[in-house]
C-alpha cells in the first residue's frame, strides 16, 4: 500500500481534544497512522490515497467542532 501524509493545522489544539479527534479520524477509510503535535497544533495522518483524501479529514475535523487553519 502506497501511503500519503496529510498535515492538518487545528486551531488551539489541546491534549484533551485528542480523545475526540483520534477516533473521528481513525474511523475514516484508509487511515494508517495518526500523530498529533499539540505544541504545533497539527494532526499528521498517514493514509491510503485510494481510499481517502485530505478533504475527508478536513471535513471530519470541522464536523467534530474544531477549526482548521
Positions of predicted regions on the chain:
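Short, ordered beta-strand-loop transition motifs
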Residues: 1, 37-38
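Compositionally biased, charge-rich low-complexity tracts
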Residues: 4-5
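Short, surface-exposed ligand-recognition loops at beta-strand->loop->(often short) alpha-helix junctions
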Residues: 8-17
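Short acidic amphipathic segments
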Residues: 25-37
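A generic structural motif
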Residues: 41-46
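Helix N-cap motif at beta-to-alpha junctions
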Residues: 48-52
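Short hydrophobic/aromatic patches at helix-to-coil boundaries
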Residues: 65-69
